[in-house]
Amino acid sequence: MKRSFLFLQGPCTPFFERLAQALKTQGHEIHQVHFCAGDIFYGRGIAASWFNKSASHLSDFLQTVYQRHGITDQILFGDQRPVHQPAVQLAKRLGIRNHVFEEGYFRPRWITLEREGVNNHSLLPHDPQWYWEVGGRLPDDPFTVAFKSSFVDRAVHDVAYHVAGLLNPLLFPRYKNHAGISAPVEYAGYVKRLTHLRFIREREKIRARKIALGKAPFYVLPLQLNTDAQIRHHSQFSDMRELIEYVLVSFAKHAPTDSHIVIKNHPLDIGWMNYQKIIADCEKRFDLAGRVHYLEEGGWAMLGSNARGVVTVNSTAG
């Protein structure tokens, strides 16, 4: 059955462009909405409409696009971007299917594609018991297809997308990035942190190994990014500082007195928060001196396999 697909914003890669071309090859109609110059850069060869008005006009604009092109399906990456939230709701009201991509719930080698929403808006059951029951029936080694995707490749695409965005003030003057920080600030943070990691990487690996192979029982708390959409939109925490305090209060009250906890930074953190200072302050306030260890990097596999437990907040490490 022939369908008409509308593509909204995708990842900062050629993925949506290639998916659109594949659907077109199968005989489906393809259209796209450009919200910024980066969308144009990664939407070459796809018929598109530009949205460069204020957000209050988006629903009317989309409804016109739906009608003009007979849209039956809408494809997007993430359901919490400002331009996606009203689009998802409007499509639902009009009987248009939403197909929402997201970073994989399981990594590597997995991506997530769900109908109508992801994460907290997923149609999957919210009852933990369901996952215990279904998980027990799944194969231990599900079939996966290995693929190569280096950090450098992804970084090049990300930079290209945001370099194109330099034209936004001219072409899309009302566009607001969905990320919590600007690309230049993010890139500067990466450079600073990666430079720092060059000098401490081996030391951190040694520390992680010592903890993992030591006699003291320990737990691991892998941090998430402060800019993570699920933290900002679907959690009780405004940032990782609040999470750290919440977990350490519980650890001080309930964990065995001989146990330790390792707090490991996210590999893509840009260094906005001084976690060492935050954790040191919590150690004093909650009487945890010597039981809390902070790692910038290193040894996740060894730590995870030797830990008594892992405390997660929207982390694939769990």
What are these regions (language model features)?
Residues 26, 172-276:
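Conserved catalytic-core segment of nucleotide-activated headgroup transferases in glycan assembly
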Residues 73-85, 296-318:
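A donor-sugar binding/catalytic signature common to diverse glycosyltransferases
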Residues 93-98, 259:
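A short helix->loop->beta-strand "cap" motif at the edges of active sites that frequently abuts
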